[in-house]
């Protein structure tokens, strides 16, 4: 196979020579047979880096990498040197194998592309004219087989796409059928309810009435509980010294005030028997990083009534209670006053 070494006519330095390719002057490295692509592009008023970015160049490099089983680094290499030196300046740049020269030259010059195009057309026309019948028929068969193979591949791709489209259409129909069945079922259920004399609006209205009745009952229970708490409070004051403490310490009532790192309700109360109070305290310490006991009272006979009295009095000072949670952020008292108030309320049971 011909090499670019055969078009070299003058040595520049070492293995680097001047050459001629059609109307293009070349710099050829006879050691590798590669040409200086950088200099060829410059002579055509172009830049090699721009050609190297094209999709065409990437496909060519990929093709020759696969065909020749070599890496890109072996396909092209760069010669560096001092461009201030006139001789060295002539040979610096990126070198490519001869397989790339036609594409780069055509990219640089439309005239060169036209010339090469005419040469190629003339070559294949002459080849056809000089071909004997047997060779020509073999060539025709080969070309037709390739075309048929391409057509078959395209038909297979098209069939796969059509199959996927059919699957999507079928899936869409099934989804629509399911939605239709759901709508029919809803209509059927609503009709059944109406036949039974039940209307959704009536059910909603009845639910609202029931909720209102429950709310009224809750209010009545709250009033009743308040009266019971007052009676129990009086009984507690009267029998405190008489009622014996449980023999087991774990069953004695405790009232505990905690402080936690909670932005909304930093204070928390525990009212329970000692054994349950310990479990509740442990749970709080598992939930929060910072938990401290501000107040721990042993209540007798009941810690629940103490909490009722605490809430009744401190709510008047702006303290907010949410079940066991307490907030004094918008109240008239501080933490020290909160603790003192709870202790005072607890001590009031002795003022008989």
Curated annotation (Swiss-Prot):
Signal peptide: none
KilA-N domain ranges (all copies): 15-123
Transmembrane segments: none
KW Coiled coil (keyword) present: yes
Pfam family name, one: KilA-N
Matching InterPro entries: DUF3627, KilA/APSES_HTH, KilA_N
Swiss-Prot/TrEMBL keywords: Coiled coil
Residue stretches in coiled coil: 129-236
Family: Belongs to the IIV-6 006L/238R/313L/468L family.
Protein's name in the database: Putative KilA-N domain-containing protein 006L
Organism annotation: Invertebrate iridescent virus 6 (IIV-6)
């Amino acid at each position: 196979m011909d090499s670019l070494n055969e078009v070299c006519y003058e040595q520049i330095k070492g293995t680097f020579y001047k050459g001629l390719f059609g109307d293009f002057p070349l710099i050829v490295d006879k050691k590798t047979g590669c040409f200086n692509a950088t200099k060829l592009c410059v002579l055509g008023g172009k830049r090699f880096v721009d050609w190297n970015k094209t999709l065409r160049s990437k496909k060519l490099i990929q093709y020759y990498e696969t065909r020749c089983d070599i890496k890109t680094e072996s396909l092209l290499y760069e010669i560096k040197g001092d461009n201030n030196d006139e001789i060295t300046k002539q040979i610096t740049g990126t070198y490519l194998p001869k397989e790339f020269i036609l594409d780069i030259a055509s990219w640089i010059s439309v005239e060169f592309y036209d010339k090469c195009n005419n040469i190629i057309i003339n070559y294949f026309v002459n080849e056809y004219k000089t071909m004997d019948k047997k060779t020509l028929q073999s060539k025709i068969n080969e070309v037709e087989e390739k075309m048929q193979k391409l057509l078959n591949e395209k038909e297979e791709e098209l069939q796969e796409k059509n199959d996927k489209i059919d699957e999507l259409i079928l899936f869409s129909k099934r989804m629509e059928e399911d939605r239709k069945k759901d709508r029919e079922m809803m209509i059927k259920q609503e009709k059944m309810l109406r036949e039974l004399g039940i209307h959704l609006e009536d059910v909603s209205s009845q639910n609202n009435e029931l909720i209102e009745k429950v709310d009224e009952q809750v209010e009545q229970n709250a009033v009743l509980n308040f009266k019971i708490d007052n009676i129990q409070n009086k009984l507690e004051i009267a029998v405190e010294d008489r009622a014996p403490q449980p023999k087991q310490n774990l069953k004695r009532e405790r009232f505990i005030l905690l402080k936690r790192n909670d932005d909304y309700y930093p204070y928390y109360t525990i009212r329970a028997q000692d054994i349950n109070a310990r479990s509740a305290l442990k749970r709080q310490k598992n939930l929060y990083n910072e938990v401290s006991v501000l107040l721990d009272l042993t209540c007798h006979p009941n810690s629940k009534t103490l909490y009722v009295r605490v809430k009744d009095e401190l709510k008047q000072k702006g303290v907010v209670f949410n079940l066991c949670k307490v907030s004094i952020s918008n109240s008239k008292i501080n933490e020290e006053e909160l603790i003192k108030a709870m202790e005072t309320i607890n001590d009031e049971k002795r003022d008989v």
